[in-house]
């Protein structure tokens, strides 16, 4: 989905938000419906659930997540946080609902129900996604020339590296929960709790960027949450209490990242340039989203005998996630202090 950000940006510029979101909604439902008839064929699932659904999701997500930037000037971060928060809240609900559907029906009917739900919700919703009347599309033009600017390159590298650990926790939380003796059903509920923390982080991060600390300071704090929770808390999470602390702080940090990057671009590159830069930046995140979790999984598989799982088997993956977050943080800190060296300033 994220790899289509540039194409989605072009589609929005040519077709508008409504038609782009409508096209995405149709493709998402179609991909799930067709996948329901091919549950035993990996190649067909790759095409239907991977490609068709992925293209539709890319079009929908881009339309939904960038439209608020056209409407809001003062509270952009909060607007983005509410939109992205809806996504993580949906993930919390659907993780439990999908698990129940698979248990009580089967995979095929789960795909079909999800497809009909996507059509029933996303198609009507697409008609409400519009840009302000009289607003021009000139600032939607992709600003490829930014690659000549050192500050933009630092933003690209810093945020791209920071993407590597973002989806490691939701992949490992069910596995880690089962290693602590919980059932599969409880593990899914624990994953939903992480998604709820992510929802809070997305909304709270946007509010913090707009009102309290500023976008850059908020992004620094967000990456600290991700890095320290992975390096310090997760490796010691041998009890439910410590694991809960990890779920809360890591979920808040991972969620806030998504709502903080757009206002951070506005603070560093100019608010009027955000929509011309954001599709390019999001496309560069593909490597982190695609390779981050498989690398962590490979590290975990090399950690020891997985038949007798304990906290120590997960520590290398946790250290990897935390280290990648802190490396990304160093780039953001450099950008922050090139803006101003004063510590107690909202930026």
Regions found by a protein language model. Give the residues of each.
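Helix-to-loop junctions at the C-terminal end of transmembrane segments
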Residues: 3-17, 201-214, 300-301
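A late C-terminal transmembrane helix in Major Facilitator Superfamily
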Residues: 268-312, 321
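Conserved MFS/SLC helix-loop-helix module at the cytosolic interface between two early adjacent transmembrane helices
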Residues: 3-43
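Structural signature of the two symmetry-related core transmembrane helices
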Residues: 19-33, 216-232
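Extracytoplasmic gate region of multi-pass secondary transporters
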Residues: 148-209, 215-217, 257-258, 262, ...
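A membrane-interface helix-boundary motif in multi-pass transporters
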Residues: 100-116, 298-327, 342, 346-347
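Helix-loop-helix hairpin linking two adjacent transmembrane segments in secondary transporters
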Residues: 74-75, 82-133
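Intracellular juxtamembrane helix-capping segments at the cytosolic ends
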Residues: 50, 57-72, 79-80, 169, ...
